[in-house]
A protein has these predicted regions:
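Bacterial N-terminal signal peptides that target proteins for export
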Residues: 1-10
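Predominantly soluble domains enriched in secretory-pathway, periplasmic, or organellar proteins
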Residues: 4, 14, 20-326
Length: 326
C-alpha cells in the first residue's frame, strides 16, 4: 500500500506540475475581427495552439491585473466578454453599452473603461459588481483609451471630432479637450505620466502633449521611401520602459516606425505584414508583436536587433493583441 501511495503521489505531483506549467506558459492572444475568433499563440514555439469562437466583431482586448482573465470588446454583440485563460472558455459578460470598440483597465484592477463608437460615450464599468458606474459624453467616434500610471487621469481620443478628452477618474468629468491631427487612434502615457503620445491616422502624425498643461509640445511625422504619404497612417503606439525606443504602427504603410524618444528621430522602419494595427510586448520587452489586418498574421520583432524574427498566421483581420506571462 505504501508503494502504491508513493507512486500515486508522484503521478499526481507530475500532473499538477504539468498543469501549472501549461497555465503559466507565456501565450499571446489575438482577436480576429472578421472570423469572430480568438487565436492563442504559444510564445515558446510561436505557433497557434487554439482558436476560440467568441462574440461578433471582436476588437479591443485586455488582460485582468492577475492575468487570469481576458476582457474582449465584442463590438457587434454589444458586450464585453470575459474569458477564463486557464480553461479558454467564456465565463461571463460585462455591460458595455452599444458597439464597444476599445478597452482599458485602471491600475486598481477593478475598473474598466470602454469606448462606445456609435454613441460618442465613454462607459465606466465596475468589474466585481458587473455594473456600469458612469457614462461620459465625449466626441464623435471615440476610440483610443489610456489610463495614467498613477490612476488619476484617463484620456479618450475621438476620431471625427479630432480631439483628446481628458477625464478625471475620481469625478468621471471631462476636464479638458485638446485638438489633434485628423482621426486620432491610439494614446499612451509615458512611464512618469508627464507626457501623452497620440497617433493620428489620417493626419499621419504622432503628437506629444504635456499632461499638466494639456498642450502640444511636439509633433512627429513619418516618411517612408517608396510609400505614398496617404498610406502612412499611424495607429498603435508602445513605449519601452528601459530603452529610448517608441514603436508606432503605420497601418497600410506596412511598417513599424522605431522612434528615439530622446531625439524624436525615426531610427528605422521595420517591414511587417499588411495594414499593421496594434502592438504588444512580451514580459521583458525583448519581443514586440504586431497585428497585421489585411495579411491576417502577427509579426514578431526582436526589439534589440529591430528585425522580424517570425510571422504567425492567425485569423482574418487580426485587431487586438495581448501577451500573458503569469
Amino acid at each position: 500500500m505504501r508503494t502504491q501511495f508513493v507512486v500515486t503521489s508522484i503521478w499526481l505531483l507530475g500532473l499538477w506540475a504539468t498543469s501549472m506549467s501549461v497555465s503559466a506558459m507565456p501565450q499571446a492572444y489575438v482577436t480576429n475581427e472578421k472570423d469572430n475568433t480568438l487565436s492563442i499563440i504559444d510564445m515558446n514555439t510561436f505557433e497557434v495552439t487554439d482558436t476560440l469562437d467568441i462574440g461578433e466583431r471582436p476588437r479591443g482586448f485586455i488582460l485582468s491585473a492577475d492575468q487570469a482573465h481576458a476582457y474582449i470588446c465584442a463590438s457587434d454583440s454589444d458586450r464585453i466578454q470575459i474569458i477564463d485563460l486557464d480553461t479558454h472558455t467564456i465565463v461571463g459578460d460585462l455591460p458595455s453599452g452599444e458597439d464597444p470598440e476599445t478597452i482599458a483597465l485602471h491600475p486598481n484592477g477593478t475598473t474598466i473603461y470602454t469606448a462606445n463608437e456609435d454613441d460618442a460615450l465613454l462607459t465606466v464599468i465596475d468589474i466585481p459588481t458587473s455594473q456600469v458606474i458612469a457614462q461620459i459624453d465625449v466626441g464623435v467616434e471615440p476610440e483610443g483609451l489610456a489610463v495614467s500610471h498613477d490612476g488619476r487621469m484617463m484620456v479618450v481620443t475621438s476620431e471625427t471630432t479630432n480631439m483628446v478628452h481628458w477625464i478625471d477618474t475620481n469625478t468621471h468629468e471631462n476636464i479638458a479637450n485638446s485638438l489633434v491631427d485628423a482621426r486620432p487612434r491610439d494614446a499612451h502615457f509615458t512611464a512618469d505620466d508627464k507626457y501623452l503620445w497620440v497617433s493620428s491616422e489620417i493626419g499621419g502624425t504622432v503628437t506629444l502633449f504635456d499632461t499638466q498643461t494639456k498642450q502640444k509640445v511636439h509633433t512627429l511625422s513619418f516618411a517612408v521611401k517608396g510609400v505614398y504619404r496617404d498610406k502612412i497612417q499611424p495607429v498603435g503606439i508602445l513605449l519601452m520602459k528601459n530603452s529610448p525606443y517608441a514603436f508606432v504602427a503605420l497601418g497600410p504603410a506596412n511598417r513599424v516606425a522605431v522612434v528615439n524618444t530622446n531625439t524624436f528621430e525615426v531610427e528605422k522602419y521595420i517591414v511587417v505584414g499588411r495594414r499593421v494595427w496594434q502592438l504588444a510586448f512580451n514580459q521583458d520587452q525583448s519581443l514586440l508583436l504586431t497585428t497585421n489586418g489585411v495579411s491576417g498574421d502577427v509579426s514578431v520583432i526582436n526589439t534589440e536587433t529591430l528585425d522580424v524574427e517570425k510571422t504567425i498566421k492567425v485569423g482574418r483581420y487580426p485587431w487586438g493583441i495581448a501577451v500573458k506571462w503569469k
